[in-house]
Structures are given as structure tokens and as C-alpha cells.
Amino acid sequence: MKAKAKSTEASIASATGKLLRSYFGKGPGALYVSLAHSYLIIYLKDFITPMESVLLKQKQALKIEETRDIVMEKCMPELKAMWHNEFGIQAQHIYYDWNLANKTGVIFADLKGAQLTKHFSALSSEQEAKIHQEIKRFTEKAQKAPRNIASVRLNERTIISKREDILVSIEKELISSGFEEQLRLSKRKLEKNIINRSYLESILKQGIEDLFVDWDFQQDIGYVVFILQAEK
């Protein structure tokens, strides 16, 4: 089963990389796929185009994010169809985020049904409680405390936390008034700046290499994805 899962993940990485290359003009240097606990997560490395490199040197990161959001809006339906047609994976919603300074990114999806291909050791109850405490703290500081938080560890280096019911009234009004893109860009920066990485690293006893956030504003759901450093 492990060999089959690895083969599927490698095939997903190859097909996804080709599709991203067709939309962005350059694919990621490497893709790492995790398929577990009803989630598909793809970690991208060395993912930046020559034009984006120029804009980044000119401190135009926001312009890059805006452009990528437009491209991803067109790309996501094709990604969803490809995963379903080639691998039988039914994604409910696709999420994504970037770390332009590191030239990294993540694309992930929550899957329909119990599509559980494998499991990894769960977080300890103490770790989970403390992680949720920090997620509640920074989410409350940015908007309001979540009604519910659920976290799973997909593998040695990937943790995903789901937050429900986090939007405040002004955010809901901005979304209904057509300012969803502006809200997304602002919240990305805000949440990453206020999360206490060193505290979480002390709980996990593992460094955090990358941290990503995204939302389904219509369902009032937010996610945090932690990519951990490889254990030495």
C-alpha cells in the first residue's frame, strides 16, 4: 500500500507541475505531495518566474500575489478536473498560498468523502491543545476566536489546522461588496505576522520552515498549513 501511495503521489506531482507550467510559463523546481486524512497538499519549491523575480527585487510582492490570484482562478477548475479524471480525487475546494521570499508555495484541497490513503501519527493531546491555543489567540487578534479548530498531522513535516466561523461583520460586508481579493491579500500578511512561530516550534520540538494561510470566505472557513523542517 505504501508503494502504491508513493506512486500515486509522484504521478500527482508530475501532472500538477505540468499544468502549473502551462499557466505560469515556469513550473516549480520540486513538488512534494501528501495525500492523507481527506486532504491533498502539494508543497512547491523554487517556484518563481523571471518576471516575478524582477518585480520582487523592486519590492512589488503585492503585484505578484494579485497576478497569481488571477492565474489560479483560471487554473483551479482544470486542476480539480485533472485530479478527478486521472486519479479519482474529488476536491471540494482548492486553496493556495505563497512565500515569495522563499520561492515556495502550497496548493491544497479538502476532499469529498473518506478518501484516506494513509495515516501518520497524530499530534499528542498536549501538542494539539497548545497549538489550538495559539491559533485561537492569533485568530482572535486578527478577527475573532474560531467556533471550532481541528488539526491533523499528515506526515513528518506537514500539519494542517482548520478554523471555522472566524469572520467578523465588517469582513463579511467587504466580501458581499466585492472586496474579497483585497481582504485576502491583507489577511495573508496580517495573520502570518502575528502568529508566534517560536512558541509553536517549542511545542513541536521542530522548526517551522514555511507557514501558509487561506480561506473559503463563503463557508467562513480558514486554514493554516505548517511545513516543518526535516528532523536531523
Which residues does each predicted region cover?
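Extended, charged low-complexity segments
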Residues: 199-232
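Short, hydrophobic/π-rich interface segment
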Residues: 72, 76-79, 165-207
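N-terminal ordered "arm"
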Residues: 1-49, 53
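A low-complexity, Ser/Thr/Gly/Pro-enriched, surface-exposed linker/loop concept
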Residues: 49-63
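Surface-exposed beta-loop interaction hotspot
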Residues: 99-156
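An N-terminal amphipathic alpha-helical segment
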Residues: 34-51, 137-175
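Hydrophobic, ordered structural segments
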Residues: 70-114
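A cross-kingdom feature marking solvent-exposed beta-strand/loop segments within repeated
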Residues: 1-4, 27-28, 63, 81, ...
